[in-house]
Design a protein with these regions (language model features):
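Class I Rossmann-like S-adenosyl-L-methionine
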Residues: 1-227
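Conserved SAM-binding loop and adjacent beta-strand
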Residues: 228-236
Length: 236
């Protein structure tokens, strides 16, 4: 067969972090931070890996039910690495702006590299099947007439959280609140007074109350002052 393309560093890193969560019970954010530090990934690659880890782990309940519907087999019966690759594929296909062909091909390449060629046909078939519906369509097909279940699937939340939001907010506001809950927080970086200046934190929005901070999207470790311990991450 033709030589398999090498998986890109961002997807490999995301896979390694998510596999640590799956097999060792690691916390996704800590596993991601450790892997980003070790791989020295920055900029767009780090941002892509971060979205892939955050979104895949956040949507695990939804992705597993879609994988089961697409493959007619329980994800628990798949080996852990295959589960992780397929969840990543589902997140890219259904929740990110990754073109379907690229998401499927990169998932097959990743599986071939980190697990072995024997699983590439399976990953290819299930990923393609996942791509035949939108997230909305999968949620409706799987959830059926259970409106809470459909909303849970569509917003990547467990049903108990959807019910808790409904009890507090009422039905009309629930979906907007759940979707807002999925938005990644933007880090607030703050200098250690006397060790760094605010302008060393790069472009961002100056904090409202503190003269020492900046609200700045992206990976905090891209900032030299953070890497060197002269600045850190802190809520205002």
């Amino acid at each position: 067969h033709q030589k398999r393309r090498k998986a890109d560093p961002a997807r490999r890193l995301a896979y390694s972090a998510l596999l640590a969560v799956e097999t060792h019970g690691a916390y996704a954010n800590l596993a991601l931070a450790d892997h980003l530090r070790a791989a020295k990934l920055t900029g767009r690659d780090a941002a892509f890996a971060t979205e892939l880890v955050d979104g895949t782990s956040r949507g695990t309940g939804t992705w597993d039910r879609i994988i089961e519907a697409a493959s007619c087999r329980a994800p628990a019966k798949l080996q852990p690495g295959v589960r992780v690759v397929l969840r990543m594929a589902a997140h890219q296909i259904l929740a990110m702006r990754v073109p379907t062909r690229a998401a499927v091909a990169s998932s097959v390449d990743l599986a071939g590299q980190v697990i072995g060629e024997r699983v590439t046909g399976l990953v290819n078939a299930i990923s393609r099947r996942i791509s035949t519906h939108s997230l909305e369509e999968w949620a409706t097909e799987i959830g059926g007439r259970d409106a809470v279940d459909v909303m849970a699937l569509r917003t990547l939340h467990p049903t108990w959280i959807v019910k808790a939001f409904q009890d507090r907010l009422g039905t009309d506001e629930v979906e907007d609140a759940l979707l807002a809950d999925n938005e990644p927080p933007v880090p607030t970086l703050v200098v250690r007074p006397g060790l760094a200046q605010r302008d060393e934190l790069g472009s961002g929005t100056p904090t409202r109350y503190s003269p020492w901070g900046v609200v700045r999207p992206g990976n905090p470790s891209d900032v030299a002052a953070v890497r060197e311990g002269r600045a850190g991450i802190q809520d205002e």
